[in-house]
Every structure is written in structure tokens, then in C-alpha cells.
């Protein structure tokens, strides 16, 4: 998987094959001011966070519940230190695990499963994921799981990935948002239109707090989701305005990017901004606001809707 040299691991991964795209501000300013997070932190009476030890503060693993048997959400990227820290944390608190939830298939969330099974072979039948593999258990939208002190309700939220699941912690009116809503910065997406619908769906649950897969606790989840939606709609408007400005001749994606992303590093432009603009254009085409024609094997876009 090709990536910009200075944006490896954690929630900066870009999978070009799946057209997971990112924003220029996501890849620059947002990476410069990450907060200091402890390797292990008790966030609430029911939630302990363990950092995945991968880049950019890594992927959060959450230990959920209050009793001797609890569940965890996500397993990091497979960094050996993560397994050591998790094992020590569980032993110090005399905790065993009953369920392992994977928010989605990306490697920085599933990579620790082999280490987890090496440490706890009894969990072999307790790995849960939407669209599961042959050795995993299914998670369905609305499915409820319980451990002492915690009732977890699964919410299917595709867009970042087709199998993405979020989890509501009923006792706290909180949501484990996975990669759909990050503690810091903006998520990358596979399908922008689907992702925006997912954000609206998540917002409809009216959870107050978010526990993201990357970054610190989101203390005002409705405001964060509203900001994400506003940003996506603002980007759409910018692309439409750009097309309108240059519409005397239909343009390919790269030319729209050159106008829209002036001043962006060329590698970031190619790896992040251009795929993102292409995703915006595809969504706008589905909405009937833009269209394209093929010239010399290249899509050339033009606006057809009213701004």
C-alpha cells in the first residue's frame, strides 16, 4: 500500500486501491498538534483506553465493563508493545475478556488479533466483526451485547469502510465511533455520500460523548459530527464553484485539484487531495450536480446543476 513517507500508520493510512481519500488539512495541520495521551488511561468507571503504539498516537483499544470479565474494542496494528501493555493492564486489574469487537477490517484495527490469541487462546471463538471472516463471529446493526456494567449496542456505519461498526455504551450515552469520527482531525472515506449518511445516522442516536479509534475523547459528539458534515458540504460547494469558474472547458480531476488545492505539496496532492476531489465529483454526479464526458480515455467533468 503506497503512502506518503511522513504519514505512515495510525489514522493517516491511505489505501489507493479502495480510493480511501483524505483532505489536505487532514494530512498537514491536523498531524502537528496531537495531544499527549498516556499508554493506559481510565476514562470513565466503565472504559479504559490502551494505546496501540503505532504512529500518530496509534489506534485506541478500549476495555469496557466494570466486572472481572469485560470486552475490548479494536486490537491495534500488531505492535508487540501493545500486546505487552494490554496483558499487563488486564493482569493488574484481574480482568478477563469475553468478547473482542473489531470496528472494521483495516490493519491498524485488526493487526493485534494474532498476539491476542497467542496470549488468550480461549478467545478464538470470541472475535466479532461485521462481514466476518471464516474464523470470526458476525456483528449486525442493532445487536446488543452485555458484560457487567456495560450494555453495548452495535450501529452499522459504512462510508469509511463497508463493514464499519460503531458501538453505543448505553450506560454513558456514549459511542465508540471507530474511524468514522476521530478525536482529532478528519477521517478518510471510501464513499463520501454513504459516509455523510452515516454521520447523520450516528447523530440521530443523540450520544453525548465519543470514544474514537484515534485521538482523545470527544466531549461533545453532536457538535463534532455537525462540524464534519458542514466541512464535507463546504468541500462540495468549493468543487462546484471551481467547476463553474473553469467551465468554459470541461476538466479532468487533476485540473480541478490544481485550482482547488493551490499550494499543496505535489506528493500529498497526488496521494490524498486528488483522490478526495475525485470522490467528491463522484458523489456530485450521483446527486445530478455534475457530469463527465470521456476524451482520450480521461474523464472531463463539468457542472450541470444550480449552485
Curated annotation (Swiss-Prot):
Provide the alphabetized UniProt keywords: Hydrolase, Metal-binding, Zinc
Q: Does the keyword Aminoacyl-tRNA synthetase apply?
A: no
One biological process term from GO is: secondary metabolite biosynthetic process
> Has UniProt tagged this entry with the keyword Electron transport?
no
Q: Give the pathway listed in the UniProt entry for this protein.
A: Secondary metabolite biosynthesis
Q: What is its EC number?
A: 3.1.2.-
Question: Could you tell me which InterPro entries the record lists for this protein?
Answer: LACTB2-like_MBL-fold (IPR047921), Metallo-B-lactamas (IPR001279), RibonucZ/Hydroxyglut_hydro (IPR036866), Sec-metab_biosynth-thioest (IPR050662), WH-like_DNA-bd_sf (IPR036388)
**In a knockout, what does one observe?**
Impairs the production of monodictyphenone and any of the intermediates of the pathway.
Q: Cite the active-site annotation.
A: 108
Any one GO molecular function term: metal ion binding
Cofactor(s) for this protein?
A: Zn(2+)
Coiled-coil parts of chain: none
- Known CDD domains for this protein? LACTB2-like_MBL-fold
Amino acids binding Zn(2+) 1: 104, 106
Catalytic activity entry: atrochrysone carboxyl-[ACP] + H2O = atrochrysone carboxylate + holo-[ACP] + H(+)
SMART domains linked: Lactamase_B
Q: What is the role of this chain?
A: Atrochrysone carboxyl ACP thioesterase; part of the gene cluster that mediates the biosynthesis of monodictyphenone, a prenyl xanthone derivative. The pathway begins with the synthesis of atrochrysone thioester by the polyketide synthase (PKS) mdpG. The atrochrysone carboxyl ACP thioesterase mdpF then breaks the thioester bond and releases the atrochrysone carboxylic acid from mdpG. The atrochrysone carboxylic acid is then converted to atrochrysone which is further transformed into emodin anthrone.
Report the family membership.
Belongs to the metallo-beta-lactamase superfamily.
Name of the featured protein: Atrochrysone carboxyl ACP thioesterase
Q: Which organism is it from?
A: Emericella nidulans (strain FGSC A4 / ATCC 38163 / CBS 112.46 / NRRL 194 / M139) (Aspergillus nidulans)
Gene assigned in the entry: mdpF
Amino acid at each position: 500500500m503506497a503512502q506518503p513517507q511522513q504519514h505512515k500508520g495510525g489514522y493517516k493510512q491511505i489505501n489507493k486501491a479502495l480510493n480511501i481519500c483524505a483532505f489536505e488539512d487532514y494530512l498537514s495541520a491536523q498531524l502537528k498538534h496531537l495531544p499527549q495521551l498516556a499508554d493506559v488511561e481510565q476514562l470513565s468507571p466503565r472504559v479504559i483506553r490502551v494505546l496501540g503504539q503505532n504512529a500518530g498516537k496509534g489506534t485506541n483499544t478500549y476495555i469496557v465493563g466494570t466486572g472481572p470479565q469485560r470486552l475490548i474494542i479494536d486490537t491495534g496494528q500488531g505492535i508487540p508493545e501493545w500486546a505487552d501493555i494490554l496483558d499487563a493492564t488486564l493482569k493488574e486489574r484481574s480482568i478477563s475478556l469475553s468478547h473482542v469487537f473489531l470496528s472494521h477490517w483495516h490493519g491498524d484495527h485488526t493487526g493485534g488479533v494474532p498476539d491476542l490469541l497467542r496470549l488468550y487462546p480461549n478467545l478464538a471463538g470470541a472475535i466479532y466483526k461485521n462481514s466476518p471472516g471464516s474464523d470470526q463471529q458476525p456483528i449486525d446493526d442493532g445487536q446488543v451485547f452485555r458484560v457487567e456494567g456495560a450494555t453495548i449496542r452495535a450501529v452499522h456505519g459504512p462510508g469509511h469502510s463497508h463493514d464499519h461498526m460503531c458501538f453505543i455504551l448505553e450506560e454513558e450515552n456514549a459511542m465508540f465511533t471507530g474511524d468514522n469520527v476521530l478525536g482529532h482531525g478528519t477521517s478518510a472515506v471510501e464513499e463520501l455520500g454513504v459516509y455523510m449518511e452515516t454521520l447523520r445516522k450516528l447523530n440521530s442516536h443523540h450520544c453525548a460523548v465519543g470514544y474514537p479509534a484515534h485521538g482523545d475523547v470527544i466531549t461533545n459528539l453532536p457538535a463534532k459530527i455537525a462540524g464534519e458534515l458542514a466541512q464535507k458540504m463546504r468541500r462540495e460547494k468549493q468543487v462546484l464553484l471551481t467547476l463553474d469558474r473553469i467551465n468554459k472547458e470541461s476538466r479532468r480531476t487533476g485540473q480541478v485539484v490544481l485550482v482547488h488545492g493551490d499550494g499543496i505539496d505535489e506528493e500529498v496532492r497526488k496521494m490524498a487531495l486528488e483522490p478526495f476531489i475525485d470522490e467528491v465529483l463522484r458523489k456530485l454526479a450521483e446527486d445530478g450536480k455534475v457530469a463527465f464526458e470521456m476524451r482520450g480515455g480521461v474523464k472531463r467533468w463539468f457542472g450541470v446543476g444550480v449552485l
